[in-house]
């Protein structure tokens, strides 16, 4: 594979190669939301279902729509390779409250929280319309807030506050507590990035 956008394509190529050696039975034993029919895995991401061929990676959207961007495809590969079912205890956590959160908080803040604040906090009506289009669950927190089923049993909330003359817009992203055990810190960053990008694509 000729790598042009190294930041996105090199990680994808790496995990696509690891994916070739994946044991499908081991995946479905770890992840109850994933189906395997002998040729393809089927799984959902933010309300859309995708089929991923194995061992030679190929992805298709079951709704016939656009394929997810490469970072989302890499996230799906890492999910199949590394994640597992973890029961949600009903609590919500910030990124900082989870393992390694303190170490990654600076890049996370810029890549997720600041981006969400200035992308959505200045356009609340469009943000609400996009989230409702994605059939997200409205929250009573923030000036606007919604809950999403990301993948499997993992859920996320995004809360946005509109800016004014005194304060800039603000945002917070909350994760269902099972993220702490089910995903590495870098994957939690990517999950936030994917959520923001997907909402933005609907605005």
Feature-to-residue mapping (PLM):
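Domain-length accessory/inserted modules outside core catalytic folds
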Residues: 50, 104-112, 116, 141-142, ...
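Short Lys/Arg-enriched alpha/beta "domain-start" segment
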Residues: 1-39, 72, 79-134
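A recognition module on extended beta-rich or small alphabeta surfaces enriched in W/G with H and D/E
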Residues: 176-203
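Conserved binding-pocket/active-site segment within a compact domain
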Residues: 121-181
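Short, charged/polar micro-motifs that form catalytic or ligand-binding hotspots
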Residues: 62, 66, 117, 144, ...
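Short amphipathic C-terminal alpha-helix that caps PH/PH-like domains
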Residues: 76, 80, 192-195
């Amino acid at each position: 594979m000729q790598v042009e956008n190294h930041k996105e394509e090199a990680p994808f190529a790496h995990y696509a190669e690891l994916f070739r050696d994946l044991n499908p039975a081991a995946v479905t034993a770890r992840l109850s939301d994933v189906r395997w029919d002998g040729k393809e895995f089927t799984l959902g991401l933010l309300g859309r279902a995708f089929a991923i061929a194995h061992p030679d990676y190929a992805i298709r959207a079951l709704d016939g729509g656009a394929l997810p961007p490469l970072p989302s495809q890499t996230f799906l590969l890492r999910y199949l390779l590394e994640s597992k079912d973890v029961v949600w205890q009903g609590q919500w956590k910030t990124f900082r409250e989870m393992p390694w959160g303190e170490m990654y908080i600076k890049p996370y803040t810029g890549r997720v929280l600041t981006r969400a604040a200035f992308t959505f906090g200045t356009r609340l009506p469009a943000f609400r319309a996009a989230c409702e289009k994605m059939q997200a669950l409205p929250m009573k927190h923030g000036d606007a807030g919604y809950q999403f089923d990301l993948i499997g049993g993992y859920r996320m909330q995004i809360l946005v506050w509109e800016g004014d003359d005194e304060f800039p817009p603000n945002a917070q992203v909350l994760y269902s507590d099972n993220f702490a055990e089910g995903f590495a810190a870098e994957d939690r960053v990517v999950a936030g990035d994917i959520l923001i990008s997907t909402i933005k694509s609907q605005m």
